[in-house]
Curated annotation (Swiss-Prot):
GO terms for molecular function: GTP binding; GTPase activity; guanosine tetraphosphate binding; ribosome binding; translation elongation factor activity. Belongs to the TRAFAC class translation factor GTPase superfamily. Classic translation factor GTPase family. LepA subfamily. It comes from the Bacteria. PANTHER family: TRANSLATION FACTOR GUF1 HOMOLOG, CHLOROPLASTIC, TRANSLATION FACTOR GUF1-RELATED. It is an enzyme of class 3 (hydrolase). It holds the Pfam family GTP_EFTU_D2. GTP binds at D17, H18, G19, K20, S21, T22, N134, K135, I136, D137. The keyword Iron does not apply. This is Elongation factor 4. PROSITE patterns: G_TR_1, G_TR_2. Signal peptide: none annotated. Its main location: membrane.
Length: 602
């Protein structure tokens, strides 16, 4: 075991694409964790999606041995944390496992919204934060301006910020020295009962569930009986080790150390992130603070384009859940789309990642219904309140007293030339402006928004109106009552359940008209007229009609009596009327997919 004063636990906080994973690679290379031949780009990002999108999804850890300039040997534990808002809870647990953080800011881009959220969390944990200004070798780099931003926006002294370029290897030694000198050593008591935090877990086909732990007090050894305090389950440890970044098996882990254990656990859902691990025979009296059960925030339906793929989809979702307990799914049946699953996600990025992994790793073609959030329905006649996940399941309006919807607080950074467009977008989405601050050439906006308005296409719209320069971060602030209604779309008088949605009463007409217009453009013409209607309850609020294809039944009448033509036209009219009653409208898959991707022109 390493003495406490020679351990440093730190995480790297950075916005997407500011060079976090590249910096981690350089630190591993410099301390000799891997030889030059073994180095691959972004060692800690294992999934292809992580590498391609330049994001980190799961927390990873690596132990580095570093000999400082004063000749002392130190063990540095690097926690590579996710940077995205959907994984905010995973981030908070990873940060809680450390004593300090490197704040990496791109010298050409400056401070962004996600950086801020994680920095404030780190400050709450009383961490020592070392600012690192990365990419200083870029032609557009402005290190002095970025230093000023760090001081003005975050309130951290940045005069001793380390200037570096992870790609070129500039300033890496300065970063390592700053870690040793400025980040405090962990505290802990080896003789106290075992207390360790479960930081993250993932499924390995050979080892079962691998659990990432940070020891607070006591020690962990192979063969020890441990207990998860929140889950209440006991397990026998069969492996203890750490990542360098290759797996290294150890005899034990002591206070302040970060490593992994395996205990023949088969499902990730048994290991909740943030749980306290203690000794089964000699338990600690109090669990660690801050534990939360992660709840899905955004729901949507996933349906296979080919109905024969249903079993394959079910199996694929099961495999993904092995590695991601925060994702939930249950079977559902839709009259329009057939059999599929209703899935719950932490947020929009989470939904996108799962969708992309299903199509890429499992080769599935999917239709995704419009994402929706969880509404609280307060019922009349003392029925209490129920949670609504799927708009199609909404009970009769007469039984509902009021509907509460989730709200978020959003922080938006935008260059001042795009401010007007962003303010209009937030206003259109029922936003309430809380604060507006000018920092240099950029504006920091604080808005309260209904989550329902954000999940649809807010992020894409924000990026397009600001030419990609705006950054956005949010957290939930609770539920508020809203004037919400269920809007259904009817084609030829029949309700299409997959297109039902809950909207604000004021936005219903515009959204309904848009939906009908889009369906009109996409459904092919039939031999009879097809009405497409958007309705709230029994009231139709928008309508479009697809004209019938006309066959010229009078073509064979040359001259002659007009009554002959009239008779044929009347006969055709009767036939069309009968057709409209009994004919079924064929809605192509493309129409569904396009109607559900409303965001393109809203």
């Amino acid at each position: 075991m390493t003495p406490l004063d020679h351990i440093r636990n730190f995480s790297i906080i950075a916005h997407i694409d500011h060079g976090k994973s590249t910096l981690a690679d350089r630190l591993i290379q410099t301390t000799g964790g891997l030889t030059a031949r073994e180095m691959s780009e972004q060692v800690l990002d294992n999934m292809d999606i992580e590498k391609e999108r330049g994001i980190t999804i799961k927390a990873q850890t690596v132990r580095l041995d570093y000999t400082a300039k004063d000749g002392q040997k130190y063990v540095l534990n690097l926690m590579d944390t996710p940077g995205h808002v959907d994984f905010a809870y995973e981030v908070s647990r990873s940060l809680a496992a450390c004593e300090g953080a490197l704040l990496v800011v791109d010298a050409s881009q400056g401070v962004e919204a996600q950086t801020l959220a994680n920095v404030y969390q780190s400050i709450e944990y009383d961490h020592e934060i070392v600012p690192v200004i990365n990419k200083i070798d870029l032609p557009a780099a402005e290190p002095e301006k970025v230093k000023q931003e760090i001081e003005e926006i975050i309130g951290l002294p940045a005069d001793d910020a380390v200037l570096a370029s992870a790609k070129s290897g500039i300033g890496i030694d300065d970063i390592l020295e700053a870690l040793v000198k400025r980040i405090p050593a962990p505290k802990g008591d080896i003789n106290a009962p075992l207390k360790a935090m479960l930081v993250d877990s993932w499924y390995d086909p050979y080892l079962g569930v691998v659990i990432l732990v940070r020891i607070i007090d006591g020690s962990l050894k192979k063969g020890q009986q441990i207990r998860f305090m929140q889950a209440g389950t006991t397990h026998l440890i069969d492996r203890v080790g750490c990542f360098r970044p290759k797996i290294e098996i150890l005899d034990s882990l002591g206070p302040g150390e970060i490593g992994f254990i395996t205990a023949q656990i088969k499902e990730v859902s048994q290991t909740a992130v943030g749980d306290t691990i203690t000794d089964a025979k000699n338990p600690t009296s109090t669990p660690l603070p801050g534990f939360k059960q992660v709840q899905p925030v955004v729901f949507c339906g996933l349906f296979p384009v080919d109905a024969a793929d249903f079993d394959k989809l079910k199996e694929s979702l099961g495999k993904l859940r092995l590695n991601d307990a925060s994702f939930s799914f249950e079977a559902e049946n839709s009259a329009a789309l057939g059999f599929g699953f209703r899935c719950g996600f932490l947020g929009l990025l989470h939904l996108e990642i799962i969708q992309e992994r299903l199509s890429r790793e499992y080769d599935l073609d999917l239709i995704t219904t419009a994402p929706s959030v969880v509404y609280h329905l307060n019922m009349t006649h003392g029925e209490g309140s129920i949670d609504l996940h799927n708009p199609a399941d909404m009970p009769d309006v007469t039984r509902i007293d009021s509907i509460d919807e989730p709200w978020i607080e959003a922080t938006i950074y935008v260059p001042d030339q795009y401010l007007g467009a962003v303010l209009k977008l937030c206003q259109d989405r029922r936003g309430i402006q809380k604060d507006m601050t000018y920092v240099g050439g950029r504006v920091q906006l604080l808005y309260e928004l209904p989550l329902n308005e954000v999940v649809f296409d807010f992020y894409d719209r924000l990026k397009s109106i600001s030419r990609g320069y705006a950054s956005f971060d949010y957290h939930q602030i609770g539920y508020r009552e809203g004037d919400l209604v269920k809007m259904t779309i009817m084609v030829n008088g029949e309700v299409v359940d997959a297109l039902s949605m809950i909207v604000h009463r004021h936005a219903a007409e515009g959204r309904g008209r848009q939906m009908c217009q889009r369906m009109k453009d996409l459904i092919p013409r039939h031999l009879f007229k097809i009405p497409i209607q958007a309705a709230i309850g029994g009231k139709v609020i928008a309508r479009e009609t697809i004209g019938a294809m006309r066959k010229d039944v009078t073509a064979k009448c040359y001259g002659g009596d007009i009554s002959r033509k009239k008779k044929l036209l009347e006969k055709q009219k009767e036939g069309k009327k009968r057709m409209r009653q009994y004919g079924s409208v064929d809605i192509p898959q493309e129409a569904f997919i396009a109607a559900l991707r409303m965001g393109d022109d809203s």
